[in-house]
Amino acid sequence: MRSWLGEGVRAQQWLSVCAGRQDMVLATVLLIAIVMMLLPLPTWMVDILITINLMFSVILLLIAIYLSDPLDLSVFPSLLLITTLYRLSLTISTSRLVLLQHNAGNIVDAFGKFVVGGNLTVGLVVFTIITIVQFIVITKGIERVAEVSARFSLDGMPGKQMSIDGDLRAGVIDADHARTLRQHVQQESRFLGAMDGAMKFVKGDTIAGIIVVLVNIIGGIIIAIVQYDMSMSEAVHTYSVLSIGDGLCGQIPSLLISLSAGIIVTRVPGEKRQNLATELSSQIARQPQSLILTAVVLMLLALIPGFPFITLAFFSALLALPIILIRRKKSVVSANGVEAPEKDSMVPGACPLILRLSPTLHSADLIRDIDAMRWFLFEDTGVPLPEVNIEVLPEPTEKLTVLLYQEPVFSLSIPAQADYLLIGADASVVGDSQTLPNGMGQICWLTKDMAHKAQGFGLDVFAGSQRISALLKCVLLRHMGEFIGVQETRYLMNAMEKNYSELVKELQRQLPINKIAETLQRLVSERVSIRDLRLIFGTLIDWAPREKDVLMLTEYVRIALRRHILRRLNPEGKPLPILRIGEGIENLVRESIRQTAMGTYTALSSRHKTQILQLIEQALKQSAKLFIVTSVDTRRFLRKITEATLFDVPILSWQELGEESLIQVVESIDLSEEELADNEE
C-alpha cells in the first residue's frame, strides 16, 4: 500500500514539474517525433503512440466546435505543423514494422481487419473512398477557403485600420479600445495567413499517406515472396490488411484534424461569441418555415409506395412537432396577456431608436443597409447614433413607424406595388410626389418603368431594403439633435481629453456641460458636422468669457466652422445663389427678441411669421436652390420660423460667408412699410 502511495506522490510531483515547464515538454515531444523516424519501436509503444495521435485529433475537433472565435486558438497553424510531423513519424515507424516484422501492433491489425471484413477488395475500396473524400473534398476546399480568407483579410486591413482611426478621432472609442482593435485586426490577418500556409501541411500529409500505403503493399508483397517464401495470395492478403490498417491509423486522425481546420477557417463569429452548436441551432431556429416545409416534403416521400414510411414519417414529425409546440405556446401567451420580460431585459430608460415594420420588409439586406447608413451619418455629422432596434410586426402591413425614445415621430404607408423610391425636390418630375411631415422633403413611389425614367434623368432611385434605410436616414437627419445630450457630450469630451486634455479642462472651467451640450445640439439640428471638436471647443473657450448666451455662442461656432459648412452646401465651389433678407424684416425680428430667465425668444405676431414664410416660399418657387442669408443676430430666429416646413433650406449669416465666398444675390425679400406699421399697431 505504501509503495502505491509513494508512486502516486512521485507521479504528482512529475506532473507538477511538467506543468511548470511546458516549453521543455513541447521540445521533448518534437525530439521524440524526430527519433521515431530513425529508431525502430516495439509494437506496444506504437499502439500507445497511435492512441495518443487519435486522442489528440479528437480533442482538436471538439475544441474547434466549442470555440466562440477562431482567434481564441491562434496557435492552431503551429499545431497543424506539429501534428503533421508527429503523424508522419508515426507512419514511418509503422511502415518499418510492417515491412520488417509484418506486424505493426494490435491497433493497426484491428483497423485493417475491421475495414477489410473478410473481403480484401471491399477494404481497398473503403480505404480509397476515405482518402478521396479527405483529399479532394475536405482538404482542397479548406485550402481554397484559407487562401481566399487570407487574401481578403490582407486587402481589407487598411480599411479596417482607417475605420478604427476614424472612430478614435470622433470619440466613439478610446485609445485603449482602439489599440485592442488594431491588435485584433493584425492578429486576424496573421492567423489567416498562417492557416493558408499550414493547410499545405495537411494536403501534403494526405498525399504522403496514399504513397506510403502503396509502398507498403508493393514492398511488403516483394519482401514476403522473396524473403519469407509466402505464396502470392498469402502475401497480398497479409500486407494489404496491414497496409490498409496502417493507412487508416494515419488517415482517420488526419481527417479529424482537417475537419477541425475547416470548422475554424470557415467560422464567422457572431456578436454574442457563442460556440458553433449554439449559433447553428439559433440561426436555423430563426427560419421555422424551412423546417416545416422539409417536414412536409418528408411526409410526401413517405406516402410514395416503396419508400420506408416509418423512417420518413418519424423524421417528419421530429422536425414539425417542436415548431408547432413553440407556436402554440406563443399563441397561448398572446391570448392570456403579454409575456413578462426576462430579468436581464428590465433596464431603466427608453429605447433610443426603434424601427417598426412588416415582416415582408425585414431582411438581412435591410440590417446591412441600416448599419451602412448609420456609419455614413456618423462620418457626415460626427454624431454616434444608437443601434436601430427593429421590431417586426406579427402580421404583414404597409405601415412603417419610427420611434425615438418610445415615442412615434414618423409613420408612413408603403404601397405594395411600389418597388422603388425617389427622395428630394425632384420627386415630382417622374410621378405624383408626397410631402413628408416636419419639412423632411418630398418622396415619390415608383414602378419599374418609372424608376428607369428617373434614372434616365440622373436621379438616385432606391430599391428593395434601401428604400427603408433612405427613409430612416431622413428621419434621423430631422431629429439629429435629440441624440446629443449631457451624457453624450461627456462621452465626447472624455474621448477628446486623451489627446487634448488641456483644451477640455479649460472648456470645463469656462462653460458648464449643459451649455456645451446645447451648443452641440443646436449645431447638429441644422446639419452642421461636429467632427472637428477641437475647433468647436477652442471657439467656445475664446467666446465664453465675453458671451453667455448659448444662441450667440452657437453662431460664433458656426462662423468658425464656415469652411466646413460651405463645403457641404457647395462642394463644387460655384457662386452661391442667395436669397437676401431685407433690413425691414431683420429690424422687425431684432426688435421682437425677448430675453428671460427661461431663454431667448421672439415676440413676433403669427401674422408676420406667416408673411415672412410666404415671401420665402414664393422666392423658392422661382429658384428652388437658394441659400437664405441674414444678419448673425437674427439668423437663428428666422431659422425657427422656417424649420417646420422648410427644414432642408439652409439659413446662413453674412459672417459665415466671409469675404472669400462667391455669391450671387438672386432674390431679396422684405416687408413693406404698411406691413411693418401693422405690427407696431
UniProtKB/Swiss-Prot annotation:
Lineage of the species this protein comes from: Bacteria, Pseudomonadati, Pseudomonadota, Gammaproteobacteria, Enterobacterales
Q: Where in the cell is it found?
A: Cell inner membrane
Q: Gene encoding it?
A: ssaV
Q: Chief location of this protein?
A: membrane
Deletion phenotype, per the entry, is: Disruption prevents SpvB-induced F-actin depolymerization in human macrophages without affecting intra-bacterial SpvB protein levels.
Q: Which UniProt keywords apply?
A: Cell inner membrane, Cell membrane, Membrane, Protein transport, Transmembrane, Transmembrane helix, Transport
GO cellular component term, pick one: plasma membrane
Q: Which residues cross the membrane?
A: 25-45, 48-68, 73-93, 118-138, 206-226, 244-264, 295-315, 409-429
Q: Specify one Pfam family.
A: FHIPEP
**So what does this one do?**
Component of Salmonella pathogenicity island 2 (SPI-2) type III secretion system, required for secretion of some type III-secreted effectors including the SpvB toxin.
The protein in question is named Secretion system apparatus protein SsaV
Q: Would you kindly state one Gene Ontology biological process term found in this protein's UniProt entry?
A: protein secretion
Q: What membrane topology does the UniProt entry give?
A: Multi-pass membrane protein
What switches on expression, per the entry, is described as: Induced following entry into host cells.
